Amino acid sequence: AYFLAASPDRKTLYVGGAFSTVNGAAHSRFVAFDIASGQVSPLVPNLGLNGSVKAIAASGDDLYIGGAFTSVAGEAHSRLAKLSLAGGQFALDSSWRAGASDEVRDLVADPLSGRLIVAGWFKSLDGYTSSGHLGAVTLASGGLANWASHPGYEVLDIARCGTKLYAA
């Protein structure tokens, strides 16, 4: 596993990585566990990701995943995807179209500003090179958000503390 994230209600643990099975069942690079029982949760079906998941962020009934994948559930998604809870399971939100030119390593969802902060090895975010290595897209549509940073090097980890964002 590359990344672990708890749901906002602390009842579910989301796990991303490069695995293809969990307990003998197909789970392509992303799975959820019920924290109380330790069992695989039916919340996340096998999404058929073609590359690893290295970042997960939760916001309300939505999950955002990032990594090295270019396909989710048979649809082209360049290293970023949004999953929305519907009918007791998370499903791919096909209308959310954010994309990064290279691997995404970390995500921070900021519901107050409506932005998803994205960090990684990419040189462009949603086609804009000024967002290299660290940028933001909107939680709602995945379009480039009005936020910019120019770290000049790859950002592998980000953390928010109050109104400040720290990057390493």
What kind of region is each of these model predictions?
Residues 1-168:
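Extracytoplasmic surface signature
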